[in-house]
Amino acid sequence: VFRAGIWKPRTRPGYFEGVGSLALQWMKKVKLETGMLTTTEVANPNHIDLALKNEIDILWVGARTTVNPFIIQEIAEALRGTEKIVLIKNPINPDLSLWLGAIERFYSSNIKNIGAIHRGFSTYEKTKYRNNPEWQITIDLQRKLPDLPLILDPSHMAGRRDLIFDLCQTALDLNYDGFMIETHNDPDNAWSDSKQQITPDSLKQLTQNLKVRRATNDDDFYLETLNGLRAQIDVHDNKLINTLGNRMKVAEKIGLLKKKNNVAIFQSKRWNEILANMLLEGEEKKLSEEFILKFFKAIHQESINHQENIIKKD
């Protein structure tokens, strides 16, 4: 499939926003000369009307559109009953319900050929990616919609061409169905997102180097070993849940003590000490800083919730 952004919604005005409907004739030429299917982003009913009249094969809805249920509903109504393939990118913010809601609106408009595009999520925390993967969100999406085709957009996720291959390999290992990768004959001079573009030759090399793994293996030794290791995981998970439950009981006792002594729930000095210690412990156990921060922030929030419940009781 040949992908091109005809209309390019940008975060801020003044940047290249695509050449507009003029490019629809170029897409027709691409299809005629290569035999490839064509796809572009649509953001309103007018885009849809022009794309359909010019025989664009696949339409995708961008991340900035997915966040708005009103616009999604307008687009779904404009496409009602179409047999075209419609791909929905994840919303900018890491909100599975918002993504699911957009997909459901297209299903409700009698559109059957639907897929999802994972392009990563914006975050205040600095990471090496332009948009953080948050793989767990797409794992949850696959669990809720197991038959929904899922495509990775490593270009927008990475923001840098040197990170694209590893993201693609991870996606394959997580049973993704394909990729949407930006290519350019002269990436450094591309009019938009030049750092994330790769050449067609680089794309060919990338696809040749990717390893497609089997979904499973029926070998008896493999299955026996796997089941044994999974049993160990189950034991550790149960211990983890019990430990967390016991930790919350201690947090409740602390909450009761604070209530009796009229002390605020949140103690920033203590929280900073916990984080610093756990980051050191995590590093020794080869756990990433990102994981430790997310894990203990979640634990801390749950502890606060338990203490608040204690303090609110008469």
Regions of interest found by a model, annotated:
Residues I71-Q205, N209, A215-F221:
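Catalytic alpha/beta core domains of metabolic enzymes, predominantly
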Residues Y15-A23, A63, V67, P94, ...:
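Alpha-helix N-cap and loop-to-helix initiation/capping positions
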Residues I56-D57, D177, D237:
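Receiver (REC) domain switch/active-site residues of two-component response regulators
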Residues R12-E17, L37-V42, G62-A63, P94, ...:
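Active-site mouth loops of central-metabolism enzymes
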Residues R3, E17-V19, G35-N44, D57-I71, ...:
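Catalytic beta/alpha-barrel core
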Residues R3-S21, N185-S194, I254-I265:
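Glycine-rich, proline-tolerant flexible connector loops at the mouths of alpha/beta enzymes
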Residues A215-D314:
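Domain-level signature for soluble enzymes in the chorismate/prephenate branch of the shikimate pathway
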